Amino acid sequence: MNQDDKKKAVAQAAVRYVEQDSIIGVGTGSTVNYFIEALAPIKNDIVGAVSSSEASTERLTALGIEVFDLNSVDQLSVYVDGADEITEHRHMIKGGGAALTREKIVAAVAQKFVCIIDDTKNVGVLGAFPLPVEVIPMARSYVAREIVKLGGDPVYRQGVVTDNGNVILDVHNLKILNPVELERQLNNIVGVVTNGLFAARGADVVLTGSESGVQVNE
């Protein structure tokens, strides 16, 4: 299987975690796009979805799946999303698509977080993939200086504005040995909205697409 085949396989496998008559959380990214397509045959079995990005909202709406504002929903049965990197402890780096803040919010409301990935995303230690940090625009330079103090090399993601109207700093050269602590430290910097470490609340289920099929880690 090539990488796209692996993504399609895990996206299809994630459908079994979707409960009938429920509202589900839907993430953002190339693997999630396949999951949205996989929802088409069962779209009449669910009430609708809460989306983590404008891009996913457009795809869901195009399929005729109702998209709800999170403020009108008490809880979500499941949240399905991908990852840029993930460890055996189910800690992740997310946010390559700049949707990290809404992803983290929707994940917090969900009873179960199902992470769908291909096997290239598995790592021993997080940090080879640059860690995205969403920042209030006026605080960009200050936050960058504070990140340098933590040992990172922040790079401004030129030309990108998040759905929330903010900017992204991608932090390079981090070897993240304690992701829970670094997530907290970064979020404590004034001007940071959130960062792409999903460690304090990691994945509950990981579906990995590989040459041998879909591996399930629950």
Curated annotation (Swiss-Prot):
It comes from the Bacteria. Keywords: Isomerase. The active site is at 103 (proton acceptor). Pfam families: Rib_5-P_isom_A (PF06026). InterPro entries: NagB/RpiA_transferase-like (IPR037171), Ribose5P_isomerase_typA_subgr (IPR020672), Ribose5P_isomerase_type_A (IPR004788). One of its GO terms (molecular function) is ribose-5-phosphate isomerase activity. Pathway: Carbohydrate degradation; pentose phosphate pathway; D-ribose 5-phosphate from D-ribulose 5-phosphate (non-oxidative stage): step 1/1. Its EC number is 5.3.1.6. The keyword Manganese does not apply. Belongs to the ribose 5-phosphate isomerase family. NCBIfam families: PRK00702.1, rpiA. This is Ribose-5-phosphate isomerase A. The lineage of its organism: Bacteria, Pseudomonadati, Pseudomonadota, Gammaproteobacteria, Alteromonadales. The gene is rpiA.
